Amino acid sequence: MEQLFSAGISLLLSKTYPAAYSCFNRISDEDFSVLYNKALCCFMVKWYDECYRLLCESEQLMSGRNITREAELPEAFLRYDHAEGHPFHPMPQGIPVCLAYRQLLLLKAETAFRLHLYSEVKSISACLGGKYKHIEKLINNITDNDNL
């Protein structure tokens, strides 16, 4: 399993999404990081329905764990994360659950936007305290489209 996961991460980083997905798909013991990485592969090839389904499944696996709204990071890192943070990178194994959940929500917001699930995007933004610049841009795009 570790070799498949490592291979999947390497392939994901090299943008070889079909091969990365194949590696993650062969892992029988799916934890939230495996499901997230499969979802990211789906997002990158514009298979948004499957991406959203996998993210919801991954989120279910996280439920009941100690998920905090904000990772305990120094202020400088939080400012950077809020301004520059994006979900388009693999999720490593062993990542603290609070960071994994934040990363999952960021990708889920992007996916929900592409599926026109605008209330979901707004709900995720509220859950994250409206602090993430790229999610707020998505919401502004929703608002701009509503005004057309």
Label every PLM stretch briefly:
Residues 1-26, 107, 123:
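Alpha-helical segment of the N-proximal tetratricopeptide repeat
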Residues 24, 63-98:
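Flexible helix-coil transition and linker loops at the boundaries of alpha-helical arrays
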Residues 32-37, 61-74, 130-143:
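Boundary/linker segments of alpha-helical solenoid repeat arrays
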